[in-house]
């Protein structure tokens, strides 16, 4: 009997890469003319980004710079959920961005349904914050990977533990 192959579908954000992106974004903000004298800053508190700027316009520019740096470092920007803008001290505005780690139940169900609708001979099961896909044919598994990549999911997914 053929050995079963498997892989895991996960959704992770590499925190060291986020920290590096923040450092390069802060460096760029320090040299940009439109940020001269601005109280703009970006910090990482646990798994949450905290952006502080003078006003809403500068906040949007700050986010654009940060997103550009995150993309260069291959950090999925889909996995950042921003809160509403709030007033901070000193006439500044603050916005928090939560870094989503893992696949929640709702998205795991979407992935499971997508795999079941494919009609391929594979099994999928939800394990905590990841989805494991097993099957005898490696070609079927590769088709599942391609299909999940093409799917319009609200989170970014990675594929690990190929066996």
From Swiss-Prot:
GO terms for cellular component: cytosol
Keyword Nucleotide-binding applies: yes
SUPFAM superfamilies: YajQ-like (SSF89963)
GO MF annotation list: nucleotide binding
UniProt superkingdom: Bacteria
Keyword Zinc: no
Keywords assigned by UniProt, alphabetized: Nucleotide-binding
InterPro entries named in the record: DUF520, UPF0234-like_C, UPF0234_N, YajQ-like_sf
Family, as annotated: Belongs to the YajQ family.
Role noted for this protein: Nucleotide-binding protein.
HAMAP family reported for this sequence: YajQ
Protein name in UniProt: Nucleotide-binding protein BLi01194
Phylogenetic placement of the source organism: Bacteria, Bacillati, Bacillota, Bacilli, Bacillales
